[in-house]
């Protein structure tokens, strides 16, 4: 029992005691106390966790199934509508192709007809152009004849419209020709009276004829001088306003005269007795 009284390590009474600082009221103890309690091991098992979340998992699976069914319905509807639209488009394409083929056929037909009509028109136009050129040539020859001999040389009874047209186009020449015609009529009446009173002898008739020829030459020279003054107006009016024979109508079928040989133009007044046609020209 000696070890109880001595401070020997071998003796229990002789051992030293140690004193530790407590942390009961420190911040560390407060933080340890604020920690949550550890769950029990039964609550951490897999079957317990699955039983707690089974309702949510089932609800999610149901929602996914509903969404999938709705999407499938929409897809089916879109497919049916797309199929219907494709059928209508194919039908429209077939109709369009048939219409296009008909249009191509009609176009080829109309093109052939138009080409044929164009050729006919060109041939008719060439014929009309030739006839117009012939008529212009005849008009130019007629105007040359009128400007050389005057409008008095056109027979008013046979060519009333031509003489009227010439009087409208050339009033000055028509006035001069009227005065000349009056003078010719007065000379003609005098010649007829002289011829009736002097029918006794052939020599006196010949002398009267020569006098009448002299008077006619005098009037013709006077008319030619008047015509020479109006020749310029004739030529100027020809270029600006050519003679148009479209207003002249004939009851029979018209014939085209290429030269003046086929045109019968006579003098509008009676010729004095005993005068030849060569004396007038």
Curated annotation (Swiss-Prot):
It comes from Kluyveromyces lactis (strain ATCC 8585 / CBS 2359 / DSM 70799 / NBRC 1267 / NRRL Y-1140 / WM37) (Yeast). The keyword Transport applies. Residues 170-235 are annotated as: Disordered. Residues 67-92 form a coiled coil. It is found in: Cytoplasmic vesicle; Vacuole; Cytoplasm. The gene is VAB2. Component of the biogenesis of lysosome-related organelles complex-1 (BLOC-1) composed of at least BLI1, BLS1, CNL1, KXD1, SNN1 and VAB2. Keywords: Coiled coil, Cytoplasm, Cytoplasmic vesicle, Transport, Vacuole. Residues 172-213, 221-235 have a biased composition (Polar residues). Belongs to the VAB2 family. GO terms for cellular component: cytoplasmic vesicle; vacuole. Component of the biogenesis of lysosome-related organelles complex-1 (BLOC-1) involved in endosomal cargo sorting. This is Biogenesis of lysosome-related organelles complex 1 subunit VAB2.
